């Protein structure tokens, strides 16, 4: 079973979402099914079928979140050195072709936020950077094709969600 690294915030966010699905959304959809069922013939009852689809989606999401929580590995990136790229590292990279610099912070799968530069540890660019040090080059296949980057700096900055 593969562990999923995440911050304490990411773990708590998953737990809250799971609790909301179980205590609010699940009972709500069961009630919708009961109401639709009371309207009679289930074969041609669009409300009933829509509610059943919604129920299947909610149950799938509950199972997915439960699995993710069971595999969670809560990591405090402030507790270790960032001499190479790791979970929680804030990394400045330069595209060697365009010379454009970008800053990324490596976070858990459910914590990504491109506006803040937070990228999932499972993203192609994060996977390509892991273990690299300042001055190292790496290549990554992106939708626009293969790009080559250089790591300019690595540090730890507290995450702001």
UniProtKB/Swiss-Prot annotation:
UniProt keyword Transcription regulation, yes or no: yes
Domain of life: Bacteria
GO molecular function list: DNA binding; RNA polymerase binding
Gene Ontology annotations of biological process type: DNA-templated transcription elongation; regulation of DNA-templated transcription elongation
Coiled coil regions in record: 45-65
Keyword terms, alphabetized: Coiled coil, DNA-binding, Transcription, Transcription regulation
SUPFAM superfamilies per the UniProt record, alphabetical: FKBP-like, GreA transcript cleavage protein, N-terminal domain
Pfam families, alphabetized: GreA_GreB, GreA_GreB_N
Similarity annotation: Belongs to the GreA/GreB family.
UniProt cross-references to PANTHER family, sorted A to Z: TRANSCRIPTION ELONGATION FACTOR GREA (PTHR30437:SF4)
Chain's role: Necessary for efficient RNA polymerase transcription elongation past template-encoded arresting sites. The arresting sites in DNA have the property of trapping a certain fraction of elongating RNA polymerases that pass through, resulting in locked ternary complexes. Cleavage of the nascent transcript by cleavage factors such as GreA or GreB allows the resumption of elongation from the new 3'terminus. GreA releases sequences of 2 to 3 nucleotides.
Official protein name in the record: Transcription elongation factor GreA
The organism of origin for this protein: Campylobacter lari (strain RM2100 / D67 / ATCC BAA-1060)
Gene: greA
């Amino acid at each position: 079973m593969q562990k999923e690294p995440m911050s304490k915030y990411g773990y708590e966010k998953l737990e809250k979402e799971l609790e909301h699905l179980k205590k609010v959304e699940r009972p709500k959809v069961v009630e919708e099914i009961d109401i639709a069922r009371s309207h009679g013939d289930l074969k041609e009852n669009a409300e009933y079928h829509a509610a059943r689809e919604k129920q299947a989606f909610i149950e799938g999401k509950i199972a997915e979140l439960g699995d993710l929580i069971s595999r969670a590995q809560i990591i405090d990136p402030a507790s270790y050195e960032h001499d190479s790229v790791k979970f929680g590292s804030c990394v400045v990279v330069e595209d060697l072709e365009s010379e454009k610099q970008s800053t990324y912070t490596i976070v858990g799968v459910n914590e990504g936020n491109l506006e803040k530069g937070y990228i999932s540890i499972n993203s192609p660019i994060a996977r390509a950077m892991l273990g690299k040090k300042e001055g190292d080059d790496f290549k990554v296949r992106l939708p626009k094709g293969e790009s080559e980057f250089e790591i300019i700096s690595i540090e730890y900055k507290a995450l702001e969600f």
